[in-house]
Amino acid sequence: MTIALTGGGTGGHLAIVRCLLESAIKKNIECVYIGSQNGQDKAWFENEVRFKEKFFLSSKGVVNQSKFDKISSLLHTLKLSKDCREIFKKYHIQAVFSVGGYSAAPASFAALFSHLPLFIHEQNSKSGSLNMLLKPFATKFFSAFEKEISPYPVADKFFDNARIRKELKNIIFLGGSQGAQFINELALNLAPKLQEQNIKIIHQCGKNDFEKCKKHYQSLNIQADIFDFSLNLEEKMKNADLAISRAGASTLFELCANTLPAIFIPYPYAAKNHQYFNAKFLQDQALCQIFMQNSINLDEFFKSILKLNLENISTRLQNITQKNGADMLIQKALFDNLTFIR
């Protein structure tokens, strides 16, 4: 069997693609990847040899575009979907699995036009525009936040490095795969207070702020573990006892898999405020704290860090997500729906 995996744009979407690829390989399913020249798709998968083939199309997002530009983008997407139909024929694609994001649009529409099964995984608590549009036409729609809960695909390595946290010795700041300027500034402002408490700093700052953050820590004579981006984030997480993080869904569930307690600062401009609702999923179970970016008081925030019951939260996070989530999705999509697959 050969399937197409499509979608991306951000690290969160692409992490799911990688999990699905690894699961498909275990089941002897070949995968073709269809993404975009824009976003992070090429950086993640251009050199990924496990795909049968990879295509990076000229697809673009439509968020914040004018009405004319949106119409133009839609017409361009329909043109690209024709190219995808040719890809499907050439590689004998039997099903399409979308993880969302604008780069999923051409292949997803092509699946419908080609009468191929379309399986969609929505990573966030609030569905993106493309997934909302396609949901009624999908063969199966998966979400960890829906009433019919589906497992969230998280790489095994995050589970393998899990441990129960009991004492705050190391704190990790996570701004997402591209970094976050606000969280970087927060980390730098908290650094002297953390040093006074002998709390070590691990800091993912993104490429744009790397030199600035590095120099600031040096000026404070603080030996922080600072990095722009890491494909082995689980190695950084396992050394941490608390995370200060944005609330992208992949990051949130990776933290849960690692049983790493977190304070979330949702990105305030995320579509439909989905990062807030992602974090609220845990807050409603008393498994995290949420601070809104525009109302953070540094002293109050620091007090909250010190008050957290790390052991209680870390222990209960073990029940939030489960290992082999991607395996379960592949099973539910492809093997439980064989009547739809030619």
Swiss-Prot record:
Keywords: Cell cycle, Cell division, Cell inner membrane, Cell membrane, Cell shape, Cell wall biogenesis/degradation, Glycosyltransferase, Membrane, Peptidoglycan synthesis, Transferase. It is found in: Cell inner membrane. This is UDP-N-acetylglucosamine--N-acetylmuramyl-(pentapeptide) pyrophosphoryl-undecaprenol N-acetylglucosamine transferase. Pathway: Cell wall biogenesis; peptidoglycan biosynthesis. It comes from the Bacteria. GO terms for biological process: carbohydrate metabolic process; cell division; cell wall organization; lipid glycosylation; peptidoglycan biosynthetic process; regulation of cell shape. InterPro entries: GlcNAc_MurG, Glyco_trans_28_C, GlycoTrans_28_N. Its EC number is 2.4.1.227. It comes from Campylobacter jejuni (strain RM1221). Gene3D superfamilies: Glycogen Phosphorylase B (3.40.50.2000). GO terms for cellular component: plasma membrane. It catalyses: di-trans,octa-cis-undecaprenyl diphospho-N-acetyl-alpha-D-muramoyl-L-alanyl-D-glutamyl-meso-2,6-diaminopimeloyl-D-alanyl-D-alanine + UDP-N-acetyl-alpha-D-glucosamine = di-trans,octa-cis-undecaprenyl diphospho-[N-acetyl-alpha-D-glucosaminyl-(1->4)]-N-acetyl-alpha-D-muramoyl-L-alanyl-D-glutamyl-meso-2,6-diaminopimeloyl-D-alanyl-D-alanine + UDP + H(+). It holds the Pfam family Glyco_tran_28_C. One of its GO terms (molecular function) is undecaprenyldiphospho-muramoylpentapeptide beta-N-acetylglucosaminyltransferase activity. Belongs to the glycosyltransferase 28 family. MurG subfamily. NCBIfam families: murG (TIGR01133). Cell wall formation. Catalyzes the transfer of a GlcNAc subunit on undecaprenyl-pyrophosphoryl-MurNAc-pentapeptide (lipid intermediate I) to form undecaprenyl-pyrophosphoryl-MurNAc-(pentapeptide)GlcNAc (lipid intermediate II).
